[in-house]
């Protein structure tokens, strides 16, 4: 994920390998076709697969945290539904609400919503990857794929992150 030496980590304090592992990393980077950046022998562009794995990680952790908070009763069913339905335009939201009417178990309703949001975010990140493929392959892409999704899901994702920070991660049930 961080294709540069510990000697270049600076303020980030995140790095991919120690200077003593430089030769091994060079061989791996060469084998994977990773692009060397700025003429630095110790800094490479991220492998394109890293962006997809990072997006999957971001999506799943965020959505599972919301679903788990519902199961732990940190979030009410209504709060959870509102958070997850915010990802969708009105027409799709209406279809989802119709589906929820035939599912009686609230945990199953939330699981359905969660999986619907995950599907939407996968599509958004796929689009972001394809829209930025040249920059990604050239090592010029900045940020994560999740930072390049369209406005409605981006706003909903940010709101989920804020709720997670304020209500979930600080909850006694989570901290204990």
Q: Which ranges hold each PLM region?
A:
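Sequence-structural signature of the catalytic-core scaffold of metal-dependent phosphohydrolases
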Residues: 1-113, 122
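C-terminal subdomains that position terminal phosphate/3'-OH groups for nucleotidyl transfer/ligation
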Residues: 92-176
């Amino acid at each position: 994920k961080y294709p540069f030496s510990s000697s270049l980590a600076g303020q980030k304090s995140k790095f991919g390998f120690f200077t003593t592992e430089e030769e091994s990393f060079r061989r791996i980077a060469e084998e994977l076709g990773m692009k060397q950046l700025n003429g630095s022998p110790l800094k490479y562009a991220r492998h394109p697969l890293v962006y997809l794995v990072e997006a999957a990680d971001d999506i799943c952790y965020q959505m599972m945290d919301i679903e788990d908070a519902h199961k732990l009763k940190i979030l009410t069913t209504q709060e959870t539904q509102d958070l997850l339905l915010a990802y969708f335009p009105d027409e799709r939201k209406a279809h989802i609400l119709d589906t929820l009417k035939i599912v009686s178990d609230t945990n199953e309703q939330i699981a359905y919503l969660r999986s619907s949001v995950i599907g939407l975010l996968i599509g958004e990140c796929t689009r972001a990857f394809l829209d930025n493929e040249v920059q990604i392959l050239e090592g010029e892409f900045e940020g994560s794929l999740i930072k390049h999704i369209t406005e409605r899901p981006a706003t909903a994702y940010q709101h989920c992150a804020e709720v997670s920070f304020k209500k979930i991660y600080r909850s006694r049930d989570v901290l204990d």
